[in-house]
Amino acid sequence: MTTTISQLNITPIKFTINDLIVDPVSLSENFNCPICEECIMDVNKCEALQCKEGHVHCRLCWMKSLESKKECMTCRTRVNSVDSLSKNIYLQKEFRNKKIFCPNLFRILNSGKIEIDEKFGCKEILKVDELEGHIKECQFQFIECPNDKECKTRLRKNQLKDHAEKCKKLKSECEFCGEKGLVIDDSKVHYSECEKFPIKCPQNCNSPTFNCTIERGRIKYHIENECPFTVIQCKYREAGCMLEFPRSELSEHMKLIDHSKYMEATIDQHICKFEKSEKEYKKLELEYNRLKDDFKILQSELKVIRELKFNYQNKWVITNWSQKLQDYPKPKSIESPEFMVGNLKFKIQFYPNGGLSDESKDFLSIYLYKFDDQTPSKVQFSFELLNKDFTRNRKLASTNIFHTENKWGWRSFINNSLVTTQTGFVIQNSVTLNINIEILPEEKEAFTS
C-alpha cells in the first residue's frame, strides 16, 4: 500500500511501507493482503478490516470487491459495506509498534524516484504511532522559498534561514528612501534610480579635501548652489566684472580684484531700478484709488437697486360711470396713469364694453400693459372689482411672462350688465378696482451633468 506524506508548499511524496520500515522482515505474511499482496495498512491509516469470520484484506480490495459482490473475497460471508466490517485490533496494535524511518530521510531525484539523503535527511527512527506528531515538528521536511512566487527553490525547513540571507527574491526595505517590498534581484535597478541614494558629485568634489557625497535627488541643487568646482560668475557681472571661476575661488577673487567701481555701478543700477519701481508704484496707487471710487459708485447703485420695490398695491376709482359707459363703446378703453413697479413701467387698460375680441362683447375687459423693455419679466397680478358687500367682490389673479410691449388680463372679467348700482358694484356712480402687482425673481435653470 502506498503512503503519502504532505509537506509545506510541496507536491506530496509517495512512499510504500517497505520504504519506511526499519526491519522489512518483521512484516510477516499476516500484514499482507491475500488479494493484492500489498501491506494491508499504511502509516497514515492503521486499520486492518476483516469480515466476521476474521479474514483480513486491505481497504482498497474490500472497496473494489463490494462494488460488485456483497461478500467476503475469501469465505463468501455476507458483507453489506466497508462500514459493516470490523477491525483486527491485534494486527493494528502490532503495526503501530513497528519501527520506521522519518519520511524526511529521503529526497526526490529528478527522475521522480526517492533515495536516502545521508547528508541532510532526518535520521529519526520512531514508531508508526509516533509519526503524525513527529511530522508536524520535523525541521527536515521540504518547503518552497516563501520570499516570492518567482523563487522556486526547494529546500528543507531547517535550511530556510541560510537561504533567506542569500535569496535573490528576498523582499527588503531600501535603507535610504524606505521603500518596502524590494526584491534583492531588483535592488540594483532601484539603487540606480533611488532619489535618496548617496552618489558622488559628477564634478568630483568628493576628493579627500571636500569628502562630498550627495543624495541623487539633490545633485542639481548641489551643483548650482554648493559644489566648490562649479564655475560661477562674479556677483558684480552686471556692473562690468566679467570674470568666471570655480566657486571655491570666490573669496580669493574678491580679495585680489578691486570691485569698488563695480559696486558704485551696481548701486547706480539699484537706484535706477528703485526710481522706476517708485513710478510704477505711484501709477498703481492712482489706479487703485480710481478702482476704489468706482467700487463705491457700484455699491451705491446696488443699494438703489436693492431698495427698489418689486410689488405694487393701489386703488383705481373710475368716476362718472354711467357717462363712461356711453363715452367708451366697444373696443375703446379707459387707461390708468402710468406707474412703476421696480424698474418696469406699467398701465392698466379698462374696457367698459369689452375689448377687440368677439368673446368680450357685453363683458367688462381689463388688462395689465407693460411698456417697452428688453428683458422678459415674470409678473404675478390681480384685479379686484369692489362691491358694497365685500363678500361679493369680483377678483381674478394670474401669473404671466411679459415680453416687450405686451399685455395680459381678462377679456371677460365680468358681465357689464352686473355692474350696476342695484348689484352693489356701482357706488355713487363710481367703480373701484383694487390692483396688486408683484415682479417675481428670475428662475435659475437647474444644473445638469
UniProtKB/Swiss-Prot annotation:
Its main location: cytoplasm. Residues 263-309 form a coiled coil. SMART domains: MATH. Keywords: Coiled coil, Cytoplasm, Metal-binding, Repeat, Zinc, Zinc-finger. It is found in: Cytoplasm. A zinc finger (TRAF-type) spans 133-187, 189-251. One of its GO terms (cellular component) is cytoplasm. GO terms for molecular function: zinc ion binding. It comes from the Eukaryota. Residues 311-437 form the MATH domain. A zinc finger (RING-type) spans 33-76. Belongs to the TNF receptor-associated factor family. A subfamily. The MATH/TRAF domain binds to receptor cytoplasmic domains. Probable adapter protein and signal transducer that links members of the tumor necrosis factor receptor family to different signaling pathways by association with the receptor cytoplasmic domain and kinases. This is TNF receptor-associated factor family protein DDB_G0272340. The lineage of its organism: Eukaryota, Amoebozoa, Evosea, Eumycetozoa, Dictyostelia.
